[in-house]
């Protein structure tokens, strides 16, 4: 997807350009799943892909460290003219406040939810963060394939080893070609089913 705007700086937000600490507030409260998964193990970066509900990749970018809220925020804000209606993300509980503090008007109509698979580990998060909560009252959300991203990410694992031996320039090109083929196959399958 082409870039539609630049990511602004937010000088009134302390640490806006610092490392992303996840959903932890100043008292150390918040979503502890984020910290226990990424903070302790200091996971390295890789690819962050944005998937539609049909597991077609809208785009990707390389990240140097573990994926954080800023990566997702920046991808959404710089590539979509209008914010998506629904964002299904592993750590939507931390992403929603991060986005709303920075661009409240842009994200005012966006629903941020945690997919069914990842919701299990979010023991401190309220039910308002879970897709299943909204499915009970909004039938259209029952049609959302909340595992589309996981399906797509499992496809990316096919090239993980090969890409790890390439220069960054070649790895990006290889990934772009892989995802183009992946997307074409998904789209053809959908056309065949209709």
Model-derived regions: residue spans:
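Catalytic-core elements of nucleic-acid end-processing and repair enzymes
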Residues: 1-194
């Amino acid at each position: 997807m082409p870039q539609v705007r630049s990511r602004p700086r937010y000088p009134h937000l302390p640490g806006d350009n610092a490392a992303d600490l996840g959903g932890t507030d100043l008292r150390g409260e918040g979503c502890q799943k984020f910290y226990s998964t990424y903070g302790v193990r200091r996971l390295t970066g890789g690819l962050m892909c944005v998937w539609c509900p049909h597991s077609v990749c809208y785009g990707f970018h390389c990240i140097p460290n573990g994926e954080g809220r800023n990566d997702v925020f920046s991808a959404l804000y710089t590539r979509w003219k209008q914010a998506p209606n629904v964002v299904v993300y592993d750590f939507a509980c931390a992403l929603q406040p991060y986005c709303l503090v920075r661009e409240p008007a842009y994200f005012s109509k966006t629903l941020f939810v945690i997919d069914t698979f990842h919701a299990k580990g979010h023991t401190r998060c309220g039910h308002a963060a879970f897709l299943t909560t909204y499915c009970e009252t909004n039938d259209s959300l029952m049609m959302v394939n909340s595992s589309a991203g996981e399906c797509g990410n499992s496809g990316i694992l096919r090239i993980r080893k090969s890409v790890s031996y390439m220069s960054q320039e070649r790895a990006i090109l290889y990934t772009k070609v892989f995802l183009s083929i992946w997307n074409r196959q998904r789209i053809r399958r959908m056309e065949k089913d209709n």
